[in-house]
Amino acid sequence: MTRSALKPFKNKRVMVTGRIHRVLFKNYLDRHSTFKPNVRILLKDVIVSGVSIDHLWLYETNKYYALAMELIHQRVKFSANVVPYYKINRNNNLFVQDYGIKRKGNLVTEEAYIQ
């Protein structure tokens, strides 16, 4: 499903499970900055409160780079808020509202979360 399926959860706290597929720096020159959201984490096979979604991107500070690299290719579970954001539609250059997540809980493996 697409991220528009997250619309009913707008501004609400949800449980997110997914597999960390890729971790990278948004800007490699800012890798020593502590406050910028510079780490991009790609989650695949995501389930947000029972709704299946293909993929989601998490934007985190640099301290999460090492943690996410340890958890790469593992299923993780955490709580998050669904937040709306605007992006540019490449076909006609209009702003389109889409939905993403902002992490509120810690990134832990799904097995550790259940225990």
Label the model's feature ranges.
Residues 1-7:
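Transition segments tied to proteolytic processing and entry into folded domains
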Residues 16-20, 76-83:
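OB-fold and OB-like beta-barrel modules that bind single-stranded nucleic acids
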Residues 11, 60-79:
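Short nucleic-acid-contacting surface segments enriched for D/E, G, S/T with interspersed K/R
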Residues 51-53, 73-75, 112-115:
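Polybasic, proline/glycine-rich intrinsically disordered low-complexity segments
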Residues 44-46, 81-115:
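OB-fold/S1-family single-stranded nucleic acid-binding modules
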Residues 14, 18, 56-63:
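Generic detection of short hydrophobic beta-strand segments and adjacent strand-loop junctions
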Residues 47-57:
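Short, basic/aromatic beta-hairpin or loop at an interaction surface
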Residues 8-47:
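Structural detector for short beta-strands of small beta-barrel domains
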